[in-house]
Each structure stands twice: as C-alpha cells, then as structure tokens.
Amino acid sequence: MKHFLTLNDFNRDEILAMVDVALELKYESLHIGNKPYLKGKVLAMIFEKSSTRTRVSFESGIFQLGGQGIFLSHKDIQLGRGEPIKDTARVISSMVDMIMMRTSEHSRLEEFASYSSVPVINGLSDDFHPVQLIADYLTMIECGIYLTHHNPLYPTKGKGGRNPIVAYIGDGNNMAHSWINLAGILGFELRIASPIGYAPKADIITKAQDMCIQSGGKIKILNDAKEAVSNANVVVTDTWASMGQEEQKEQRKCAFANFCVDEAMMSYAQKDAIFLHCLPAYRGQEVSEGVLEGAQSKVFQEAQNRLHAQKGIMLYLARINKIPLVSVE
C-alpha cells in the first residue's frame, strides 16, 4: 500500500508524475469541466488539528472528482476519547477508499497508516506538510520557475529549466522540512534562514543532503535572511508561531524580528522573484502588507492550487494503488 506521508515516500519521477496529474486536472477544471474519475469513492478526512484551506480543498476536491468526503473532527471519533490508533485505522479504512489525516505528532500518522488498508494522505503533521509543497511546486511551474519539466500544458516552458534558488525565511518547522525534502528529491538550491535555535531538524537536513549528491541539489542553513534571499527566484515564509505554540508567541516575535519578508528584503531577490506563503499570514510579522499584496506575491494562486494539487495526489494514489475506477471518456 502506497501512502502519502512525506515527499520522501516518492522519487523524482513519481513527484513529477503526480504534479502532471494535478496540472491536467486543473486544465480540465478550467477549460473542459470536472470529470468523475473517483465516482463512488469515499474520502475520510480526520482533523485532529483544525484548518480552513485543508478542509475546503480536500472536500471540494473529492466532490469535483465525483466522490464524497466525510469530515471527522477529534470530537467525532473515538481517537479523541482514548481509542488506540490501530483500532480506529482498521475500522475507518474498512469503510472508505482513502483517508486524509491532519494531526500533531508525525508518529501518530505513521502508526495510523501502518494499520490502514487504504491509502493515507498527510494533510499536515508537526514535522511535515507535503500536500502544500505539491501546491507550491505547481505554482512555481505556472510562474515558469522550476527544473526541467516537459508537461504539454506548458510547451514554451521547461526547455532546460531555470535551476531555481528557493529561499525559505523563518521557523524550521514542517514547511521548512518539506522544502528540504523537495530540494533533495528534485535537486534545486534551497537556502533556509532561521534564528539561532530555530533551525530545521538535523536528521532531516542530513538525509536530504545525502539525496542531493544524486539529484544535484544544494541545501544551505543560514542565520542571515538577506544572504538567503540574495538572487533567489522564490522567497517563502511561514508563521513564526505554529498551531500549538501560542504560549511562545511573544518570545518568537523577539527572536524573529529580523526575519520579516518586507519590500527591503525582497529587493535582494531576482526582480522577477515570486513570494509564497502557505497561510494564514500575519501581516507585519513574518511578511509585510506590501509584499503579501504586491505584484510578486503568488500567495492566493498558491492557496487555490491546494485544490488542484490534492486532486492530483488523490487520483495518483488511486491509480498506483490500483483502486478500481470508473471509466471516464
């Protein structure tokens, strides 16, 4: 059973194939109409952590693919009342075709997947946010910033690629970890700038750097945001205090004071660089109002691409796991 728990579950060709499915589904949705590839299929959506974008994009996505989504908060299932993960996983997976889980500890997700009889998708865990990275890479492709990519929907692009430089500014959290994964797999240059004490996990960095030997990528961990942004094609940030870190909010504001992506910082990047943020954004903290609402910002295109990226992930998983699908003309 092939799950989608981290990007490292897939190789370069598989990631690009998944992105291609997402691109094709987006094209169909905008120009032809949605096709019911997953007609009659049921997606269980388990939210131990609440979300706006994750719920709306997955629920809309499975509907557009012809299936049905079932929303389950921690109040709706016995996991919130002490039932073992393995019991919940075996029961739910016996009644649905696919499961998306948004949780805290990544180990909970891994245990759930190990007992599930259907594919499990990581909607977010404390360590990784892989669905967001598929949406981010999809956005990069649409903006012409990516490695060699020969999708027929973009025939004038991908002729050798741009060998992009991505600068991630801020907390070494699940978003940083997933960017590290993607750089190791696809082979681009990633620079992460975080305050001392807030860098990404060392084991995740080491594994990705080992992968870069084959992929040709570069991963640099820095403490200077301007150095990271210098000549970058993509500038990314995230909230300084993630869900569950509210008590650290004031402490983190002080630590990250020099890591706000504002107009001055963006001036160090390429003139045609784009700005990405997975949202929600806190204006005046990790990003200025001017950057978030400016011409370089692709944040709302990126957010909308969550829908198409996750449709691509679901359909790709259904195909490789040989889930019986309805023939669509």
UniProtKB/Swiss-Prot annotation:
Protein's GO biological process: arginine biosynthetic process via ornithine; arginine catabolic process to ornithine; citrulline biosynthetic process; L-arginine biosynthetic process
PANTHER family, alphabetized: ORNITHINE CARBAMOYLTRANSFERASE, MITOCHONDRIAL, ORNITHINE TRANSCARBAMYLASE, MITOCHONDRIAL
Family: Belongs to the aspartate/ornithine carbamoyltransferase superfamily. OTCase family.
The keyword rRNA-binding appears for this protein: no
This enzyme's EC code(s): 2.1.3.3
Protein name in UniProt: Ornithine carbamoyltransferase
Lineage: Bacteria, Pseudomonadati, Campylobacterota, Epsilonproteobacteria, Campylobacterales
Encoding gene per record: argF
List of residues binding carbamoyl phosphate: S51, T52, R53, T54, Q78, R102, H129, P130, V131, Q132, C278, L279, R306
GO function terms (MF aspect): amino acid binding; ornithine carbamoyltransferase activity
Pathway membership: Amino-acid biosynthesis; L-arginine biosynthesis; L-arginine from L-ornithine and carbamoyl phosphate: step 1/3
